[in-house]
Amino acid sequence: MKKIKEVIVVEGKDDTKRLALAVDADTLETNGSAISEATLAQIKTLQASRGVIVFTDPDFSGERIRKTISAAVPGVKHAFLPRKAGVPTKAGGSLGVEHASPAAIQTALAHLYTEQIDEPQQLISHHDLIAAGLLAGPTARQRREQLGERLGIGYVNGKQLPKRLQLFQIQPADFWAAVDQLTTEEK
C-alpha cells in the first residue's frame, strides 16, 4: 500500500475509513462544511510541516470546503474524485469519497494539482472554451463533466471552468488533447 507523506483533509470519518482501504495516509476531518478557525489553524500548521492534500466530495459542500481551505491556506494540493466514482451503491445516499473504490481513490491521489500562489496566467481563452463546445449548446454540461474527469480537476459549471483551468495552470496542449478525446468519443 502506497504511503502518502502529506496529510489528507477529508470531510468525515467515513471518508477516512475508505481512504485507509486505498492508501497509507494520515487524515484530518473537517466534520462538515462549516470549517472552524481551529481546524483552519491545524491545516495551516500541517501545510507548513508536512503538506496538505484536500480531498473532498464531488458536490457543492465539498467544493465549498475546498474553496475555504484554499483561501486560508495557500499552496495546498488538490485531489478530485470524479462524480461517477462517488455515487453510493444504495439509493438515497449522498455523493462522496466514502463510496469510492480504492482504485478510484488511488487514481485521484496520483493526479494532484497545486494552486498557483502568485497570479496565474490565463493559458486557455474564453474563445477556446466556446470553440471546444464547453460553454454553450445542448452537450456543453456533459462535455465539461467529461473534460473535468480527463484533466482530473473535477466538475465545474461554465462560469467556474476558466477559473479552474487558470488556477491549476492546465496547459493548452493538455486541454486540447482532452477536448480531442471527447470529440473522438462522440463520433
From Swiss-Prot:
Subcellular location per the Swiss-Prot or TrEMBL entry: Cytoplasm
Q: Sorted alphabetically, which CDD domains does this protein's record hold?
A: TOPRIM_RNase_M5_like (cd01027)
Q: Which cofactor does it need?
A: Mg(2+)
User: What is the UniProt remark on how the cofactor binds and its stoichiometry?
Assistant: Binds two Mg(2+) per subunit.
Which GO terms are recorded in the biological process aspect for this UniProt protein? rRNA processing
Gene3D superfamilies named in the record: 3.40.1360.10
Q: Does the keyword Cytoplasm apply?
A: yes
Please name the SUPFAM superfamilies in this protein's record: Toprim domain (SSF110455)
Its recorded reaction(s) are:
Endonucleolytic cleavage of RNA, removing 21 and 42 nucleotides, respectively, from the 5'- and 3'-termini of a 5S-rRNA precursor
Q: Which Pfam families match?
A: DUF4093, Toprim
Cite the InterPro entries for this sequence.
RNase_M5 (IPR004466), RNase_M5_C (IPR025156), TOPRIM_dom (IPR006171), TOPRIM_RNase_M5-like (IPR034141)
Chief localisation class: cytoplasm
PROSITE patterns named in the record: TOPRIM
**Binding sites annotated in the UniProt record for Mg(2+) 1:** E11, D57
- Quick check: keyword Metal-binding in the entry? yes
Q: Which GO terms describe its cellular component?
A: cytoplasm
Show where the Toprim domain sits: 5-88
Annotated residues that bind Mg(2+) 2 are located at D57, D59
Query: Kind of enzyme, top EC level?
Result: hydrolase
**Keywords associated with the record:** Cytoplasm, Endonuclease, Hydrolase, Magnesium, Metal-binding, Nuclease, Ribosome biogenesis, RNA-binding, rRNA processing, rRNA-binding
Which molecular-function annotations from GO does this UniProt entry contain?
Answer: metal ion binding; ribonuclease M5 activity; rRNA binding
S-S bonds? none
Q: What does this protein do?
A: Required for correct processing of both the 5' and 3' ends of 5S rRNA precursor. Cleaves both sides of a double-stranded region yielding mature 5S rRNA in one step.
The protein, known as: Ribonuclease M5
User: Which organism encodes this protein?
Assistant: Lactiplantibacillus plantarum (strain ATCC BAA-793 / NCIMB 8826 / WCFS1) (Lactobacillus plantarum)
